[in-house]
Each structure stands twice: as C-alpha cells, then as structure tokens.
Amino acid sequence: EVLKQKGYSTAIFGKWHLGSQKEFLPLQNGFDEYYGLPYSNDMWPFHPQQGEVFNFPDLPTYDGNEIIGYNTDQTRLTTDYTTRSVNFIKKNKNKPFFLYLAHNMPHVPLAVSDKFKGKSEQGLYGDVMMEIDWSVGEIFKALRELGLEDNTLVILTSDNGPWTNYGNHAGSAGGLREAKATTFDGGNPVSYTHLTLPTTER
C-alpha cells in the first residue's frame, strides 16, 4: 500500500494466505494485479487426511478478484507465475514497480511441469527446485534484457523448515535439529539473501 501511494505498479503472483474474503484479497490491499491461490496448495479435497482430519472445499484459483477455476493442475503453477511475473516487469519497465512472487512450490503436494520432470536426477523434490531456479533465472533474464538489473532490488527468501513428517520429498533441514512446526533451528530460521542492490538512489 505504501509503494502504491508512491506511484509504484504492484503485483503478487502465487500464494497469498492473508485472508480469502474479498476485502482481504490483494487488490483491496495495495496490489494492482493478483493471480494465484488464496492459501496453501495442500488445502484442497485431495489432501491425504481429507475426511479423517480435514474437510477442505475445492481450492480456488484467482485472477484479480475473480475465481477462474478450482483445483488447478499444480504442475502449471510455477510456469504460470513466472510468465505473469515477466510480463508484469516488461509492462512496467518505464516506471517503478513492486513484484511479489510467492511460489507455492516446494510446499507439498509437490508438482512439476513436464519440461522439468525427471531432469534433476534427484527425485521430484529436486525437479521442483530446478524449476524454481529456472523461474528466478527468467526474472533476472527479463531485468537484464530491459536494462533494469542495476536499478532493481531483488530479495530471495524462503518459508519455514521442511515438513519432515511427509518424508524426504518435503525437503531436508540438513544438519539442523528438527523441522517445520518446531521451535528448533530446523524449523524456524528463514533463509534470505539480496541478489541485487540498485546502484542508484530514489
């Protein structure tokens, strides 16, 4: 909202999870564009504990304030979010913009597009991470081609630690103790890095 007041074009593509009623959706909270899922990609009728523990309704996909479908094929999400992000950057190359790209992957259930399926030789989780790496590369490619790389702050961060009760397909905490849903180092720390620092001040 602050950036929008300063004349920035704003967009979020991906996971929102800050409320799914209309007044809580992105377009009512500072964003010009929104495409994605309103909450976690596992909150749908195909959850392995559906009926036993959960009773999730169909999972909507939003474009702006409109629901455009339910239970979207999740193998498309990373590519769809990336395509929209690149198009947003190109459309706003001559003005300030704020892009929030919040991939649903690698949150379970994992899904990967056909072009990356089996490509990592490290299983499904490896394929998913490879596609996310490709996505980051596409963002940088667009910034470079438009001459915006030196005038854009890019921050890469992640969610909590891995959900190890889903097995090794949900990631690894490496040598850190425990995982998601604990207060130990394997669950709470969030990785962060700034990949670029603008060379000009605004």
List each language-model region with its residue ranges:
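Formylglycine-dependent sulfatase
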Residues: 1-195
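Single conserved hydrophobic/aromatic residue that forms the stacking wall/gate
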Residues: 194-202
